[in-house]
Regions:
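Conserved SAM/SAH cofactor-binding pocket of Class I
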Residues: 131-223, 229-233
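Class I SAM-dependent transferase core
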Residues: 99-146
Length: 335
C-alpha cells in the first residue's frame, strides 16, 4: 500500500496538526482511492436497520470489503491485503478485538462520491455521522441549486460532519469557494479527506461554532445540524433545547444576517410535533417572517426515527418529521 504521494488538503483548526494525524489522512485517502477504483459502493442505513442486518445469521463476521467498511463487521486478518492491513493497524484505522480486526471508519456512497465517516455503532462523543439524513440533505441542496439563479461565489456548510453538503455544492458550482465548518476535529479531518477523494479544490475545512469563526457574507448557507434530544449530550446527535431544536433555531438566527442579497439558507433538520404543533416551525416562523426574507418549508419525510418516541423526553411527541427550511434574502430593487 503506497502512501507517499497522497496529497491531502490542509485543515484549518484552532490547534496544530500533529504529524501522526497527517499520516492518518494519507492512509485514509489511499484507502478511499483503492475502494473507489475497485467499484466499492455502500448505502448507509438507519442504526436500527443496520442492527437488524448485522443480527441475521451469517452476518456476525465480514466476508468482503462491504461487510468491513460498510456494515462494520469484524473480520479475519487475511481478508484485506497484508500491507494494507499493516498500514491501517499502524494508524488505528482498524483495531484488533478478540483475535479479529474491525474498522473504526465506514465508507458510504453519495452519487458518484465516497465519504469516510465513523463506524457503526456511533457511540463516541466525537462520532462523525452519515446516514439517511445525509442523503435527504444532499437532495435538498441539489434541488435548491437546480432552481436558484443566484450566482454563488461564497458558500458554507455549518456543522459539516463528513463534508457531504460542502462537497455537493463544490461539485455543482466549481467557481464557488465553499467553507466546511464544525467544532469536531474529526469531522474536519474526514471532510478534508473526502474533498480530496472527490477531486474538489474549492473546499476548505475550518473550526467554527456555527458562524462565529467566519467572516463576511454568503450566497448560500447550508446546514444539517443534530436535532435529537440526547441524554448523553453527544455533539453529533444532541440539538439541545426543546426536543433537540435549539441548535437549528440558533443557526436560523445567526445565518440570516450573513446572507447576501439573493442569498439563501437551506436548513435540513428534524421537527418534533406535540399535539399537532410543529415545535421547530413555531420557533422559527417569527424570525423568518421578517420583511427582508421570503421562505418555504417542506416536509421531506413525515416520520423519521420513530423508535425515539419510546425514549425519555419524547413521551409527548407524536412524530419527528424531516424538514427543509429555505430562506432567501430579498434583493433590493435596482434604482
Amino acid at each position: 500500500m503506497n502512501i507517499e504521494a497522497a496529497p491531502v488538503r490542509e485543515v484549518q483548526t484552532d490547534s496544530s496538526v500533529a504529524i501522526d494525524d497527517i499520516e492518518l489522512d494519507k492512509v485514509l485517502l489511499q484507502l478511499g482511492r483503492r475502494l473507489q477504483a475497485d467499484g466499492y459502493r455502500f448505502v448507509t442505513v438507519t442504526p436500527l436497520t443496520h442492527q437488524r442486518n448485522n443480527a441475521r445469521a451469517g452476518n456476525q463476521t465480514a466476508h468482503d470489503v462491504r461487510d468491513v467498511f460498510g456494515w462494520s463487521r469484524p473480520f479475519e486478518p487475511g481478508l484485506l491485503p497484508e500491507a494494507e492491513t499493516a498500514a491501517l493497524l499502524e494508524n488505528a484505522i482498524i483495531s484488533e478485538q478478540a483475535g479479529l480486526l474491525r474498522s473504526e471508519v465506514r465508507w458510504s456512497s453519495l452519487n458518484d462520491s465516497l465519504f469516510v465517516h465513523s463506524a457503526y455503532p456511533t457511540v463516541a462523543h466525537d462520532s462523525v455521522f452519515f446516514g439517511p439524513d445525509t442523503y435527504r440533505f444532499a437532495q435538498a441542496i441539489g434541488k435548491h441549486l437546480s432552481h436558484s439563479r443566484h450566482r454563488i461565489e461564497n458558500a458554507i456548510d455549518i456543522g459539516c460532519g463528513s463534508g457531504a453538503g460542502a462537497i455537493v455544492i463544490a461539485l455543482a458550482r466549481r467557481e464557488a469557494q465553499v467553507q466546511a465548518v464544525d467544532i469536531n476535529p474529526a469531522a474536519l479531518r474526514f471532510t478534508a479527506v473526502n474533498a480530496a477523494l472527490a477531486g474538489v479544490t474549492n473546499v476548505s475545512a475550518w473550526h467554527s461554532d456555527v458562524l462565529q469563526g467566519t467572516h463576511g457574507n454568503f450566497d448560500l448557507i447550508v446546514a444539517n445540524p443534530p436535532y435529537m434530544q440526547d441524554p448523553q449530550a453527544r455533539a453529533y446527535r444532541d440539538g439541545g433545547g426543546e426536543l433537540g431544536s435549539a441548535l437549528s433555531v440558533r443557526i436560523v438566527r445567526e445565518a440570516l444576517d450573513r446572507l447576501t442579497p439573493g442569498g439563501s439558507l437551506v436548513l435540513y433538520t428534524g421537527a418534533p410535533s406535540v399535539a399537532g404543533v410543529d415545535l421547530f416551525l413555531a420557533q422559527v416562523q417569527p424570525i423568518v417572517d421578517a420583511a427582508a426574507f421570503e421562505w418555504t418549508y417542506e416536509e421531506m419525510d413525515p416520520d423519521v426515527f420513530g423508535e425515539e418516541l419510546e425514549t425519555p423526553g419524547y413521551q409527548q411527541a407524536e412524530r419527528i418529521a424531516a424538514v427543509v427550511l429555505t430562506v432567501t434574502r430579498i434583493p433590493r430593487p435596482s434604482i
